[in-house]
Regions:
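Active-site-adjacent loop and "lid" segments of alpha/beta metabolic enzymes
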Residues: 2-3, 10, 18, 35-44, ...
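Catalytic domains of carbohydrate-active enzymes, especially glycoside hydrolases
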Residues: 48-64, 276
């Protein structure tokens, strides 16, 4: 494709694309996240986990202050800010890796960016809060736009279990429901891209995420990963792709593995994603994924840094 960005820009960070796969290590400072809830609520525990993730090979840290797992409880803006702001401030003072904040609330994003984060990971692709695009643009942050089928699949069995996410107006949701999954994914992300670009966010500041596991049945998550290369939304432009398969339900269902035994399945999903064009992966278990990305990059990207 022509006009594709050569790098991803987020604040003062600039990551070259196409030479390696970047790993975003997940750090949830929540009591109820689906996989690691309650483990890193204290500041000391969060900092120790961040140090471990970076030592294992994380290139970025993704900080979450509100769980979006099925059945999770809503958190006020003030509480979400109180959870993440001190952690981000300490991380920025201790480490040089980019910090991402996982939120769909503009006020939370602004507080996180003011504390030193440089990326907003928005699971609603800027459609959960009408102010989010303006905040991202004004603060020159990078943004991850995630396709989220929960927002338009009212009543779908794979979507109703997510109780903590907004829904789209029917004028937007109904046309998306009429499309096949790949087309709906592209159209959803196109809406997010349009909001970003109209607000003044540069193409170089945007990452796309197909949203595997959000409002999707197992075969649908697999289908999106298989068609990852086709998930784009700007004519003539290939935007970088992030995939977040970590410990997801579709891995457990396919492999018949409980939540705490999905590291190998996650690594396999990461390898398949890289082969299909992923530039970033978001995971809990960094060490096995770092080995996976290093080998995949050596083979698929001919990356000299991946070889000893």
């Amino acid at each position: 494709m022509t006009g594709s960005p050569a790098f991803f820009k987020a604040g003062h960070h600039q990551l070259v694309l196409g030479q390696k796969t970047y790993i975003a290590g997940i750090l949830n400072v929540t009591p109820d996240s689906f996989s690691d809830g309650g483990q890193f609520v204290s500041l000391d525990d969060a900092l120790r986990q961040a140090e471990r993730l970076i030592a294992e090979g994380a290139d970025l840290l993704d900080i979450g202050g509100e769980s979006t797992r099925p059945g999770s409880q809503k958190v006020s803006v003030a509480e979400e800010i109180n959870r993440i702001r001190p952690v981000i401030a300490q991380l920025v003072s201790r480490f040089s890796v980019p910090i991402s904040v996982d939120t769909f609330k503009a006020d939370v994003a602004e507080a996180a960016l003011s504390a030193g984060a440089t990326i907003v990971n928005d699971v609603t692709a800027l459609m959960g809060d009408h102010r989010m695009a303006e905040v991202v643009a004004r603060m020159k942050a990078g943004v991850i736009l995630m396709h989220n089928a929960v927002l338009y699949r009212r009543g779908h069995p794979s979507a109703t279990i997510f109780t903590n996410l907004p829904t789209l107006p029917e004028s937007i949701a109904e046309p998306l429901r009429q499309l096949d999954l790949l087309a709906a994914t592209r159209a959803f992300l196109a809406l997010g891209c349009q909001r970003a670009l109209e607000a003044g966010v540069a193409v170089e500041q945007i990452i796309l995420d197909p949203g595997v596991g959000f409002g999707l049945l197992t075969d649908e998550s697999i289908a999106l990963m298989a068609e990852l290369e086709q998930i784009q939304c700007l004519p003539g432009v290939r935007l970088p792709l992030l995939v977040g398969p970590s410990r997801k339900r579709f891995i457990g269902e396919l492999l018949d593995r409980p939540l705490d035994d999905r590291a190998i399945g996650t690594a396999a999903a990461v390898a398949a994603s890289i082969a299909r064009g992923a530039d970033f992966v978001r995971v809990h278990d960094v060490d096995p994924v770092a080995q996976t990305t290093r080998l995949c990059d050596a083979i698929l990207r001919r990356c000299p840094e991946a070889r000893p």
